[in-house]
């Protein structure tokens, strides 16, 4: 019986085969006509890829049926190597939560009078509630960088 093989270029090849012929035999005949090695050939009929060990009758291929020939693609996407880090990941810094932390900014004396222990920043940029850090020789605002230095008595 006669079957047709359509290639990707659109060329149609006619082959003389028997229903008992295997797919390997058909690929060998295509190699004789086209020179394409059988290991690179993929034959498709009715949307299914034909396996080498089976016969034409297994796939119900009758006379004047058309098989589609496509070339096998080797490989695929490049396999990506998993990154391995030599040093462990650094943990993100977590701020310590201190309950009633506001109490360290104020002092209450025995009369019930409240006095500030830290100076509040007078800058318009900072606004109320921003305290200046007290260093041994200065007061410093961390938000607006305003610094007040203390006068030291000079030794003579």
UniProtKB/Swiss-Prot annotation:
What changing residue 68 to G does, per the record, is: Loss of DTX3L-mediated polyubiquitination of histone H3 and H4
Taxonomy of origin reads: Eukaryota, Metazoa, Chordata, Craniata, Vertebrata
Give the recorded effect for residue 65 to A. Prevents phosphorylation in case of mitophagy. Impaired translocation of PRKN to mitochondria
Q: What is the effect of changing residue 107 to R?
A: Abolished monoubiquitination by RNF25, leading to impaired ability to rescue stalled ribosomes
Q: What is the effect of changing residue 113 to R?
A: Abolished monoubiquitination by RNF25, leading to impaired ability to rescue stalled ribosomes. Abolished deubiquitination by USP16, without affecting maturation of the 40S ribosomal complex
Q: Give residue numbers for the modification (N6-acetyllysine).
A: 104, 113, 152
Q: Where is this cross-link: Glycyl lysine isopeptide (Lys-Gly) (interchain with G-Cter in ubiquitin)?
A: 6, 11, 27, 29, 33, 48, 63, 107, 113
The entry assigns this protein to a family as follows: In the N-terminal section; belongs to the ubiquitin family. In the C-terminal section; belongs to the eukaryotic ribosomal protein eS31 family.
Q: Cross-link position, Glycyl lysine isopeptide (Gly-Lys) (interchain with K-? in acceptor proteins)?
A: 76
Q: Would the keyword NAD be found if you checked this record's keyword annotation?
A: no
Question: Residue positions of the PTM (Microbial infection) ADP-ribosylthreonine?
Answer: 66
Which residues make up the annotated site Essential for function? 68
- Modified positions (ADP-ribosylglycine) in chain numbering: 76
PANTHER family in the record: UBIQUITIN (PTHR10666)
Q: List each copy of the Ubiquitin-like domain by range.
A: 1-76
Q: Name one GO molecular function term.
A: ubiquitin protein ligase binding
Q: Does the keyword Acetylation apply?
A: yes
- The modified positions for Phosphoserine read 65
Query: What keywords are annotated for this sequence in UniProt?
Result: Acetylation, ADP-ribosylation, Cytoplasm, Isopeptide bond, Metal-binding, Nucleus, Phosphoprotein, Ribonucleoprotein, Ribosomal protein, Ubl conjugation, Zinc, Zinc-finger
Protein name (record) = Ubiquitin-ribosomal protein eS31 fusion protein
Known consequence of changing residue 65 to G? Answer: Phosphomimetic mutant that can recruit PRKN to mitochondria
Chain positions covered by the region annotation Disordered:
76-95
Q: Which domain of life is it from?
A: Eukaryota
Provide GO CC annotations from the record: cytoplasm; cytosol; cytosolic ribosome; cytosolic small ribosomal subunit; endocytic vesicle membrane; endoplasmic reticulum; endoplasmic reticulum membrane; endosome membrane
Note on file?
Answer: Ubiquitin is encoded by 4 different genes. UBA52 and RPS27A genes code for a single copy of ubiquitin fused to the ribosomal proteins eL40 and eS31, respectively. UBB and UBC genes code for a polyubiquitin precursor with exact head to tail repeats, the number of repeats differ between species and strains. For a better understanding, features related to ubiquitin are only indicated for the first chain.
Q: Which InterPro entries match?
A: Ribosomal_eS31, Ribosomal_eS31_euk-type_sf, Ribosomal_zn-bd, Ubiquitin-like_dom, Ubiquitin-like_domsf, Ubiquitin_CS, Ubiquitin_dom, Ubiquitin_ubiquitin-like
Q: Where are the zinc fingers (C4-type)?
A: 121-144
